[in-house]
Amino acid sequence: IGNMELSRRHHMIFEGPPGTGKTTVARIVAHLFYALGILENTTVIETKRNELEGKWVGDLSGKINEKVDSALGGVLFIDEAHQLYNKEDPYDKGKQVIQAFVPRLENDGEKFIAIIAGYTKEMEEFLKFDPGLASRFQHKIIFESYKPQVVAQIVVNILKKNKIEFNEKYVK
């Protein structure tokens, strides 16, 4: 986060094993980018595949558009995003979610931050499915097997180093 250039889009990929603080850091990102004046609010809409699918094959947008609309001004965090793509199933509804998500990243990309998270190997495979999806994410953060408290302390150190004011209660 400390080396990110200010740009108009700040979508991120978080990769790493479970329990490394990806969700915690997504919440911190919301507060950080709000403090920087990039986001309008600190809202974090957390979701997973089962909350994004349409009810039937052909329901292209599923609930992804509702989730993006809810996240406007804040952060949309899709945990275990790699589960959206099942290359073994040609009728998998997750593909339709991705196809509806890519235009929202492009058209509304300056109005929210999308963070997709998952396990490293699975995320790399997932991102190969749609090069358009991968190209919409400007930042990739690799999470090692740190405890959330350590990750929070790393973020605090970065914030302090960059002299960014923040409320410490949000990084605990």
Model-assigned labels for residue ranges:
Residues 49-59, 83-95, 140-141:
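Flexible beta-alpha connector loops of hexameric P-loop NTPases
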Residues 20, 51-53, 82-84, 119-124, ...:
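Conserved nucleotide-binding/hydrolysis micro-motifs of P-loop NTPases
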Residues 82-121, 128-132:
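Conserved catalytic/switch belt of AAA+ P-loop NTPases
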Residues 40-71:
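Short glycine-rich substrate-engagement loop in P-loop NTPases that contacts/grips substrate
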Residues 127-144:
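A short helix-turn-beta junction within AAA+ P-loop NTPase domains corresponding to the substrate/partner-engaging
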Residues 3-42, 66-69, 137:
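Walker A/P-loop
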Residues 84, 152-154, 166-172:
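Short conserved motifs of the RecA-like P-loop NTPase core
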Residues 121, 130, 152-165:
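Conserved AAA+ ATPase "sensor/coupling" helix adjacent to the nucleotide-binding pocket
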